[in-house]
């Protein structure tokens, strides 16, 4: 019933977040390299007449990259998005979006002047209606074609430099699956040649900012799709977990009793079709994923390679990560030592901070543990557990930011792997965002985590508690001292008052005349005689 009601609402809302805007997928836009669609509010490009933004040239950073990618001009993702567009909407103030029709994260209202903070909750703290609504929203997104975005099915060269556009429609959920595939796919070098050592969202500094933006845009898309502006992605706190406690039909899908690699037929997700998982096939054809369904969602949690991932992360592992003071270090890739990012991502040991190619820990451990669709990087976002998992990873990132208060300059400006420098635009997002733009507190982006709000209260209580205990121990002495002080003050006050009166009396007598007036003198004589 809830799903049907949501479907009825669908066309009342327009989405505006993602990859290639439908309005910019024409041969004219591609050949002119301009993506500045009109805003529906006034019909002008980028809402310029209303002061929302303007169509401007894209300024690219010229900071050098690391040595991991030795090519130039062979991948559409290089110097993003310059292969496709060199002019896009640059929005003003609190406006955002490919046509400046949205508000920046954390701002709301017709003119984007209202600021508010949304809270992401632990999935196990959701009420039954909240949990069911979340599952229904996922299903709705899976069955709704994106009205504003399309995906390219060929490279810019295969499109004859834009003169022959190659784009497909895709549903809203799979749009984000496709984004995760596209950002992490191999480079197609022509013929049968490929280059695997490249990833614009993993194994380098941009890992955490990229996935932070991915979740924010996904969250915003669901808010617009459903009209539920208070919607937030729940997180799964997997610390110290002994098994996949969200892998039940009540939550993210139990195990199929007939085939342990499939989901239970009672699950919302057992009928889902996955996309963008056949990387070797795409590479052999020098092609891109086109969004064609590729079979059911696979998951077999716990039956993974235990030599590589002996256990799920512990609370101590998380605390060790948070204790690391360097965001990035050394080569700034998966070989980096004592790097918070590399340790949290799972390429360095959460016991020592030393990179270990034989182990997959922390974030990576959860992907390996799921032993299915989620275990291969490009197509891992097919599994909705991906969202819950990365929301918790983002909460750890947020804890680190609050604990160490790094400046934006802490994020590497140069020499990171391609696409990961501070001023590099993140692939494949339009509108454009730099890696450094997301290296800020979540509260500045309009959201928080329920566990962090609680921990901050606990920190305050832990700070003030020793002083309260000391006060409680000396409280009787303080009361006694106060009483004694009052008594002493009263006595001293009384003595002081008495002395003052005596002094005034003596002073009065001293001021009497030594000789009386004549009349007084005679009167005194009269009295004496009597």
Swiss-Prot record:
It comes from the Eukaryota. The keyword Transmembrane applies. Gene3D superfamilies: Di-copper center containing domain from catechol oxidase (1.10.1280.10). GO terms for biological process: melanin biosynthetic process; pigmentation; response to blue light. It catalyses: 2 L-dopa + O2 = 2 L-dopaquinone + 2 H2O; L-tyrosine + O2 = L-dopaquinone + H2O; 2 5,6-dihydroxyindole-2-carboxylate + O2 = 2 indole-5,6-quinone-2-carboxylate + 2 H2O. Glycosylated. Binds 2 copper ions per subunit. Its EC number is 1.14.18.1. GO terms for molecular function: metal ion binding; tyrosinase activity. Keywords: Copper, Glycoprotein, Melanin biosynthesis, Membrane, Metal-binding, Monooxygenase, Oxidoreductase, Signal, Transmembrane, Transmembrane helix. Residues 495-530 are cytoplasmic. Residues 19-473 are lumenal, melanosome. PROSITE patterns: TYROSINASE_1, TYROSINASE_2. It is found in: Melanosome membrane; Melanosome. Cu cation B binds at residues 363, 367, 390. InterPro entries: Di-copper_centre_dom_sf, Tyrosinase/Hemocyanin, Tyrosinase_Cu-bd. It is a single-pass type I membrane protein. GO terms for cellular component: melanosome; melanosome membrane. Its cofactor is Cu(2+). Residues 1-18 form the signal peptide. Glycans are attached at residues 86, 111, 161, 230, 337, 371. Forms an OPN3-dependent complex with DCT in response to blue light in melanocytes. Belongs to the tyrosinase family. This is a copper-containing oxidase that functions in the formation of pigments such as melanins and other polyphenolic compounds. Catalyzes the initial and rate limiting step in the cascade of reactions leading to melanin production from tyrosine. In addition to hydroxylating tyrosine to DOPA (3,4-dihydroxyphenylalanine), also catalyzes the oxidation of DOPA to DOPA-quinone, and possibly the oxidation of DHI (5,6-dihydroxyindole) to indole-5,6 quinone. This is Tyrosinase. It comes from Canis lupus familiaris (Dog).
């Amino acid at each position: 019933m809830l799903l049907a009601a949501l479907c009825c609402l669908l066309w009342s809302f327009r989405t505006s977040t993602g990859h290639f805007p439908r309005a910019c997928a024409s041969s004219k836009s591609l050949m002119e390299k301009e993506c500045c669609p009109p805003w529906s509010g006034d019909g002008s490009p980028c809402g310029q007449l209303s002061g929302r933004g303007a169509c401007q040239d894209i300024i690219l950073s010229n900071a050098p990259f690391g040595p991991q990618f030795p090519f130039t001009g062979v991948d559409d993702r290089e110097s993003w998005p310059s292969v496709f567009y060199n002019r896009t909407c640059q929005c003003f103030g609190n406006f955002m979006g490919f046509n400046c029709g949205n508000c920046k994260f954390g701002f709301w209202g017709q003119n984007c002047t209202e600021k508010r903070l949304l809270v992401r909750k632990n999935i196990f703290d959701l009420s039954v209606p909240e949990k069911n609504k979340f599952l229904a929203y996922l299903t709705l997104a899976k069955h709704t074609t994106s009205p504003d975005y399309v995906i390219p099915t060929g490279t810019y060269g295969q499109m004859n430099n834009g003169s022959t556009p190659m784009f497909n429609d895709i549903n809203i959920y799979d749009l984000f699956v496709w984004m995760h595939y596209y950002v992490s796919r191999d480079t197609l070098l022509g013929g049968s040649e490929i280059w695997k050592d490249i990833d614009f969202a993993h194994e380098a500094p941009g890992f955490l900012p990229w996935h932070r933006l991915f979740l924010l845009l996904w969250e915003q898309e669901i808010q617009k799709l459903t009209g539920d502006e208070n919607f937030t992605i729940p997180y799964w706190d997997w610390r110290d977990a002994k098994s996949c406690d969200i892998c039940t039909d009540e939550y993210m899908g139990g195990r199929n009793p007939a085939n342990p690699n499939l989901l239970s037929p009672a699950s919302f997700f057992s009928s889902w079709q996955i996309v963008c998982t056949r990387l070797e096939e795409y590479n052999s054809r020098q092609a891109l994923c086109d969004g064609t369904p590729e079979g059911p969602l696979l998951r077999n949690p716990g039956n993974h390679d235990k030599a590589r991932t002996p256990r799920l992360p512990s609370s101590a592992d998380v605390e060790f990560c948070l204790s690391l003071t360097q965001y990035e270090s050394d080569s700034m890739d998966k070989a980096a030592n004592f790097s918070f990012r590399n340790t949290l991502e799972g390429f360095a040991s959460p016991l020592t901070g030393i990179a270990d190619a034989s182990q997959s820990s922390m974030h990576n451990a959860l992907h390996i543990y799921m032993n299915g669709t989620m275990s291969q990087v490009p197509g891992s976002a097919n599994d909705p557990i991906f969202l819950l998992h990365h929301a918790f990873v983002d909460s750890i990132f947020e804890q680190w930011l609050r604990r160490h208060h790094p400046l934006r300059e802490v994020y590497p400006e140069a020499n990171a792997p391609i696409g990961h420098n501070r001023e590099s635009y993140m692939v494949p997002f339009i509108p454009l965002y730099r890696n450094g733009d997301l290296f800020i507190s979540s509260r500045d982006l309009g959201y928080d985590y329920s566990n962090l709000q609680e921990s901050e209260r606990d920190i305050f209580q832990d700070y003030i508690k020793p002083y309260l205990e000391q006060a409680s121990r000396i409280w009787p002495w303080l009361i006694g001292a106060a009483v004694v002080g009052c008594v002493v003050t009263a006595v001293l006050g009384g003595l002081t008052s008495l002395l003052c009166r005596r002094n005034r009396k003596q002073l009065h007598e001293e001021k009497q005349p030594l000789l009386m007036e004549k009349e007084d003198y005679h009167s005194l004589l009269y009295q004496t005689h009597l």
